[in-house]
Amino acid sequence: LKQKSLDLQIREAYLEGLSALEEGDVLFAARKFNEVELLYPQSDLAPKSSLMAAYSYYVQDYYEDCIMELDRFLKVYPKDKNLDYANYMLGIAFYEQIVDEKKDTFSIIKAKGYFEYLIQNYPNTEYAVDASFKLELIKDVLASKELYIGRYYVDKKKWIPAINRFKNVVNKYDTTIYIEEALYRLVEIHYLLGLKEEAKK
């Protein structure tokens, strides 16, 4: 009877969180989900509550809180069945913070890392398609940045750093729209330097 009463308390607290989330009171929802996990850590709903708390923060654009919650989830529940979702949401939380691709390098790299990890380790997850799509967008951003810096070095006649930047596009981002310009620039520089054999490659 006592166990039944405890199970009921856990479920009621969880449902309160869901109800608050549906009504838009996301901070209260996050608090209720955290409460379930804190007071009933052995409950089957504990890991799910942690994920729901993270989602509540995400909905409100509290990305740092969302990331902290998800990081903790991965440490506390390393064998949970929803690890794919946690890694996907980490990628999304960083992805949503990319406002200026020239400045938000940290968020770009972190999002890229989580999406790549998800696709590599959970290729059949339902989140893989969206992760792949966003990964291609991120690669476009990174390739664009490499090309921009490469052009800067060309203008300054700093050929070796320019070559390195264009090679980065060719080696790392060959599926992006910037591959053709990168190849053209490499050929152009090699001809300028008299390296015709290199240009032919």
Protein language model annotation of sequence segments:
Residues L1-K201:
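Acidic, polar-rich low-complexity tracts and alpha-helical solenoid repeat scaffolds
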